[in-house]
Structure formats: C-alpha cells, structure tokens
Amino acid sequence: MNSNTKIIFVTGGVVSSLGKGVTAASLATLLESRGLNVTMMKLDPYINVDPGTMSPLQHGEVFVTEDGAETDLDLGHYERFIRNKMTQANNFTTGKVYQSVLRRERKGDYLGATIQVIPHITDEIKRRICSGIADDVDVAIVEIGGTVGDIESQPFLEAIRQLRIELGRNRTLFVHLTLLPYIKVAGEIKTKPTQHSVKELRGIGIQADVLVCRCEKKFDDSEKRKIALFTNVDQDCIFTAEDVDTIYEVPLKYNQQGFDAKLVELLNLNAKEADLSEWQNVVNTIRDVKGEVTIAMVGKYVSLTEAYKSLNEALYNAGYKKGVKVKIKFVDSEDVNENNVESYFKDVAAILVPGGFGSRGVEGKIISIKYARENQIPFLGICLGMQLAVIEYARNILGIKDAHSSELEPTTANPVIGLITEWQAEDGTVHQRTHSSDLGGTMRLGGYKCVLKQGSRAREIYQADEVVERHRHRYEVNSNYVERLEEAGLIFSGRSEDNKLMELIEIPQHKWFIACQAHPEFTSTPRYGHKLFESYIQAAIENSNN
C-alpha cells in the first residue's frame, strides 16, 4: 500500500444480512466509474482458517479466486461488480490471523513475550490489511464481517480503530450500514435501532462518518434530521439503501443520492465524473427481458440458495444476455427416484447438476442425468455434476453397473472417478495428495488451463483453443476408463495442459449435453456474461420453444 491510498471501512449493525457486501461492491463500482483503481477486502470473524470445510448450508457458497483461495461468497459479489480480480490477500479470517500469530510464537519470533489480542492479534490484522493492498490502488474498501456488538468482531474493530489513528482522517473513512425497520401497522420508520447501533460503535471508539440505512422505502428529511441528531453524523452523509428488483441497480441508486460524490469530497480524491453508461446498460438489459425459461438445478444444498450464489448469478446473467428471465427450480436430489423423476422435469427446459461433496443424494443426481440424456433435455454438469455424468454413462452405456467414484464408494471395483494423487500447478510446482491428507486446502484449487478439442461443441462455444477456468476438487475421471468411454461415444472435449486430466465432456448425438470439471460460474459477470452459460441458456430456450 502506498502513502496516498485511501481506505473505506464498511461495518454493519442491528442485524446481519443487510447487504454489506453489495453496498461495499456498489461503492467500489461507483469509484471505479470515476477512473480510480479500486480493490476490496473481506474480514471474516469466524475461527475457521477459511470457509473451505464449512457446510454451504451454514456459510453459503465457497468462492474460489484465480490464485486458488477458498473465500467468502462476498468476493463473488466483488468480482461481479468491479474489474479487479480478488486473490487470497482479499479475504482472511480470525482463524487465519491466530494461525499466523501462533506459528510465529512457536518459532520464537516474539522473543518470549506474552501473546495477547492487543497488540499481537490486532497488529496482525493491520498488517494483513495494509499488505493486501497493492501499491497502485487508489482506494481500498474493507468490509468487516459480522455485526457490531458481536464478540467475534471486536479484534477487527479495534484494529481499524487503530488504523484510523495511524493513517489519519484524510486517508480513512467509516461507513456503517444499519436497519431502519418500517412498522406497517403504525406506518412509521423506527430510528432507534440505528441510534443504538451507532452508540455501540462509538463505545468501541469508532465514530461513523457515513450512515447507510437499509429500509423498505425511502425516508424523508425529517427522519434524516433525527438520525443525524442522535448519531452525530452529518445529515448529508446519511443515505438510503432501499429494496430494489436487482442488486445491480444499487450503484445507480447510490449515485442518484450523490453517495460517490460525497466519498470523493470526504477523502479528497482526485476523481473524474462518474461514467455509469456501461452499468446502466446492464440494468437496462435486465429490465428489457421478455420471456422466461425454467432450469432445474438438482443438488443437496437447495434449502439455502446462497449455497449456489455464483451459479445462480451466472444463469441469470446468461438469461439477460439472451433476453429471458431464468427461473431456477431447485430440486432436492434426495427426493428424486426412478418412479418420480418425470414429475420433477416435465415442465423444465434444461437440467443442471452443480458441484458438491459427499454421497448424500448422489443417486438422485445420477437418475436426473440419465433422464436428461435419454430425453434430449439440455444438460450442464459442473464439478461433481461432470463426475456423475461419467458414472451414469459408464453404468448405462458401457454396462459397468457398479461404476462409481472412490470418494463416494471407496470399495468399488470400477472407480471411473478417482483421487487426483498428483497434479502440476500453473507455476510448475507439483502438488501431491493421499486419502489421509487434510481436507482443508488440499484440493486442486484456482485457475488452470484447459485445452479444447478441435471440432468439439466446447471449442465452438468458447471460440478458443484453450481457456482458463477455476477448479475446486480432489477427484477426477480415472484415465484407465477414458478409452472405453470414448469408444462408447463420450467425447472428452477438454483436457489439462499436460493431457492427463479430463476437464470437459460432451455427447455429440445429444441436443446439448456438456459437463465440466471446473466451476465456470466463478468467472461470469453481469457485464460480460459467460459463453458456456449463454450457450446453455440458448439451448434451453430452443428446447422450451419446441
């Protein structure tokens, strides 16, 4: 971080899930539209080292960065809103901070000192914030996870309080997001929760510079005056975060209120006028959709749609590009069997099986894949979805009835999917893994090149000889079965650069049947979409019309 970089800290109060991530990303979008180089960071107060081993039903999606970090789903928002790509430096947790401090303590780096939250933990938080910001960055927006008042968040709040003192008011800004409940029976907006949230923040030693008030409806100047009086925040630094039809409207709403202009003023930024024409085009495209197409997503985390956040957004973005609204029908794979499979898919235009781990619900996914293959329904498989598509093909086309994955059935005699014991990273380093290795951080993670087969549908879709997609898996197609699968009509249309790992499959006789080992949803954005998803949605539209 250079001596001119400004930092905006975004905190949240009253309740969680107010949309801190979207607010932070929207502010970054606005500043980027003014010609500034903006990066973002998420600080998570949980004690896990990273979210890699956490249940998606508790934490939501694990977003994978290009350099292979398993991170919070908010980093997905960041990449969809701004152009800069996130790295492992853009997200860290309490667990990671303590891990670093304790490792140094074991090495004797603290020279026998008593290790305490202050200064050792807070110093490590400050170090990670400052070292994670590149020298060419004009503004860094740092989101503090959790809610003010949570015991877990206190070391992070203390660290940013200290950074305000060390860097000065001209280089730091505190933006606090709170809730203004609207009581319909009384027809009133209540400001008391916001007052108490700001008071709680002040008790920690932080005075909010800007307030963002989440509310169902706009509030008038009388409410603003009341909030300003009791929170010690200037009235012109209080903004509304009202409910919108799509999160991509949020930057435009903030711009209309003059939010970005106020940030430029408060931080004395050398910025040009905002050019939001590209972002306005995104919103116009969303508003202009005419038709609707229904996609069945067959998974085991469907009770929490946040578990598939990037995938949902990739489907929606592809739909916008094709002029349709994508409706996702979430199907719990545990409920699907041979007797009821048709009832789940008779009204859908396409079927998708996403990534996942573990054996629960696997047979329901395989039955769904078989139904898509046999009934010429456009199908997209991702990660585990590709592995199960290979298993289904081996069972029902090759006739290997006990074909399985050694992850799901360790004693299977025909492991068409097996553990990757060794692979080479993009930088040339060789990674190795065994069945006894730790689960956390030991997968094939991050961006890897995939070489596309000439004449394949995948090559036609991507319009490239090779692509880079992000991975998060331990298991791959067993190379011992590849030749037999190809002879039976399955095409491996994408392979790793060294030709050892199978990355893409397709069935040429099928209307649209593609599965990939990578997670292409992580690189889809509302500005640019993603070619694979757009082709998939186009196939769904054509199938729906027929």
Swiss-Prot record:
The UniProt record lists the keyword tRNA-binding: no
Reactions catalysed, as given in the entry: UTP + L-glutamine + ATP + H2O = CTP + L-glutamate + ADP + phosphate + 2 H(+); L-glutamine + H2O = L-glutamate + NH4(+); UTP + NH4(+) + ATP = CTP + ADP + phosphate + 2 H(+)
Biological process, per Gene Ontology: 'de novo' CTP biosynthetic process; pyrimidine nucleobase biosynthetic process
Enzyme Commission number(s) of this protein: 6.3.4.2
Residues reported in the UniProt entry to bind Mg(2+): D74, E143
Alphabetical UniProt keywords: ATP-binding, Glutamine amidotransferase, Ligase, Magnesium, Metal-binding, Nucleotide-binding, Pyrimidine biosynthesis
Chain positions recorded as ATP binding sites: S17, L18, G19, K20, G21, V22, D74
Full protein name: CTP synthase
Native species: Francisella tularensis subsp. tularensis (strain WY96-3418)
